[in-house]
Structure formats: structure tokens, C-alpha cells
């Protein structure tokens, strides 16, 4: 079963976020576990973002969470966030391309 993690955060430093994500992508090149990541911004709260990361399975998501580069990125994200991070772990029950 596919698995997704959502990280909700607020920041006024989105350019730093993007640079940090680019750095994580470079460090994990060749052994990256997630197969898709999408950053979304809340239209009603311009500094609120949701990073949605998709995995082939829950086990792969947990393996990714335990990797040093992922821990470093989470610490970086906490450092540039204006509030505490909210993590959601989701099983993908249905997926359709519309």
C-alpha cells in the first residue's frame, strides 16, 4: 500500500526552504526513497505550507525518516519555521488521475 507523509509548517523564509530541499535532494541522489514530493501553500494563510511526500510503502517512509539526511532536513525545517511542525502519516487508500 502506498504511503504519504505531510509536513505542515509556517515560514516567511520559503526561499531558504527551497534551497534546503535542493540540498537534501543532492545529498540523497542515487539512494533517495521517496518517489514524489509536492509543496503547496495555503491561499488563506500565505505563510502556511504543506510538503507532501509519497512513498511506495509505509516501511519505505519509515526507512526514509530514519536516514541521517532526512533528520538533518527536519532539523533545518524546524529552524526556519515560525511554528512547530505538524507531521501526518497517511495510508493511500485510493488514487485517481482525473
What residues fall within each predicted segment?
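Short S/T/G/P-rich N-terminal loop/turn motif that feeds into the first structured element of a domain
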Residues: 1-68, 78-98
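Helix-adjacent hinge/juxtasegments
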Residues: 74-76
Amino acid at each position: 500500500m502506498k504511503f504519504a507523509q505531510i509536513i505542515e509548517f509556517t515560514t516567511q523564509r520559503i526561499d531558504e526552504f527551497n534551497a534546503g530541499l535542493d540540498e537534501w535532494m543532492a545529498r540523497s541522489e542515487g539512494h533517495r526513497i521517496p518517489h514524489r514530493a509536492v509543496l503547496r501553500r495555503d491561499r488563506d494563510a500565505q505563510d502556511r505550507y504543506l510538503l507532501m511526500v509519497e512513498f511506495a510503502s509505509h516501511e519505505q517512509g519509515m526507512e526514509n525518516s530514519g536516514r541521517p539526511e532526512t533528520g538533518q532536513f527536519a532539523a533545518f525545517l524546524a529552524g526556519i519555521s515560525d511554528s512547530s511542525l505538524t507531521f501526518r502519516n497517511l495510508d493511500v487508500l485510493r488514487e485517481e488521475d482525473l
